Amino acid sequence: MLPAQHKLNSSMQFRTVMRKGRRAGSKTVVVHLWDSAESLDGTEKQGEVASFGGPRFGLVVSKAVGNAVVRHRTSRRLRHICASIAEKSPELLSPTHHVVIRALAGAGNATSAELERDIRYGLGKASRVRTNK
């Protein structure tokens, strides 16, 4: 189970992460990653609340994934993966990171191991700092 302190709650938070964050995709998921410490200048902006209790996650599982049973099963798998990443992999995410995981159509047929591999790959790719040549 994903604790409440690790959940994105409002549509404004989802929108902020998806617009301002970096993204990386795979066959099953698209990972949007945003570090809230990058844009907060000491004043709290509406909808952009810094959370230092740990990384925060949000899930988007659309009807493209499958029927309600498949979507809920996929959501449960993704929540479990997010909880294990938040607890056991502090090197991947800092407490100021916000993550939105968007499940693609292939996520409904994927195993938990494939989903975890794709999420870790997406987090690693999205967290790399780009350098201009």
From Swiss-Prot:
Gene3D superfamilies: 3.30.230.10. GO terms for biological process: tRNA 5'-leader removal. One of its GO terms (molecular function) is ribonuclease P activity. SUPFAM superfamilies: Ribosomal protein S5 domain 2-like. The keyword Repressor does not apply. It holds the Pfam family Ribonuclease_P. GO terms for cellular component: ribonuclease P complex. The keyword Protein transport does not apply. It is an enzyme of class 3 (hydrolase). Its EC number is 3.1.26.5. Keywords: Endonuclease, Hydrolase, Nuclease, RNA-binding, tRNA processing. It comes from the Bacteria. It catalyses: Endonucleolytic cleavage of RNA, removing 5'-extranucleotides from tRNA precursor. PANTHER family: RIBONUCLEASE P PROTEIN COMPONENT (PTHR33992:SF1). NCBIfam families: rnpA (TIGR00188). Belongs to the RnpA family. Consists of a catalytic RNA component (M1 or rnpB) and a protein subunit. HAMAP family: RNase_P (MF_00227). RNaseP catalyzes the removal of the 5'-leader sequence from pre-tRNA to produce the mature 5'-terminus. It can also cleave other RNA substrates such as 4.5S RNA. The protein component plays an auxiliary but essential role in vivo by binding to the 5'-leader sequence and broadening the substrate specificity of the ribozyme. This is Ribonuclease P protein component. It comes from Corynebacterium glutamicum (strain ATCC 13032 / DSM 20300 / JCM 1318 / BCRC 11384 / CCUG 27702 / LMG 3730 / NBRC 12168 / NCIMB 10025 / NRRL B-2784 / 534). The gene is rnpA.
